[in-house]
Amino acid sequence: MKQAAARVVIAGIAVASLSACTIGDVSAPEHPTAASSPQPTLPESTPEKEPPVIEASDIHEALEAIAADNPGTGIAVAGADTVAAAGITDPQSAWSTAKVPLAIAAERAGVADPETVSRAITFSDNAAADSLWEALGGGEHAAQATQEIIGTATVPATPPRPGFSAFGQTQWPVAEQAEFVAALGCQQGTDPVLAAMGQPDPAQQYGLGTLEGSVMKGGWGPAEDGAYEARQMGLVSLGGHTVAVAIYAKAESGDYGEAQQMLTRLVKQLAAAEVEWPDAGCQQGAV
């Protein structure tokens, strides 16, 4: 069953037509429209020169070098029995990446509508994610169900910051995210979510989204100081291996577009590094 779902992801599923995404996990209207909930767009800028190729002997050395060459970023990769992380590795707001465990929790509870999952995961629709949260009972019930999927980070029952979702403010380190993604294919209720993660959204073709066949979810929003953060987690192909990756960026300028560019630059170096990458432990949803 899971391998069949993987083939669907690999082949590429037709993108759903409904798309309504807001910048960050700001509370959205119950029935959002594309006009009321604008999608993030890649910034218009002059092409930057290619970043230097990182030379390293192993994944730890590679990640340390990549993080050092990209200040303000964090990166982690995980395999069946290993995890490596560098740069900003302390817990940061999960933003919309938390919609993945939320959707899985809804799938397990039997309250996940396929279209709602597609909107919440592929297009990062906040109203759709809120629907899943409420379908789980909201508050403590939804937080506990979602936290059981994550297994590590604590999911708030109420929004710690006004105007933002409770689940989006889950503090989730990149290392724990990478480990979470590495095990996704072995978990119950993940097939529809992995399929939605594998559908390309033109508005999110940066960072991991620039790698062909990536199965990923992104999140973004303003930190408490107002500077925008952007992060992604997913399964990607590196050196012939299916690798679980989690990345984070916060631009010194505070600009969301710059944070996007930082993730893209980091991913270019990640893809070019010639090291032995660890295979994800569970690859049913792999590229």
Q: What are the language-model segments listed below?
A:
Residues K2-I10, V15, T22-E64, A112, ...:
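Structured C-terminal helix/loop/strand segments within mature extracytoplasmic catalytic/sensor domains
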Residues T46-V53, A86-Q92, T116-R119, A127-L136, ...:
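Second-shell loop/turn segments in exported
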Residues P52-I88:
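A short, well-structured edge-of-sheet supersecondary motif
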Residues P91-V111, A120, V245:
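Active-site SXXK
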Residues I104-V111, E134, E179-A183, K268, ...:
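Short glycine/serine- and small hydrophobic-enriched flexible loop segments
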Residues D130-Q188:
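Mid-domain, small-residue-enriched loop/turn segments at the edges of structured enzyme/sensor domains
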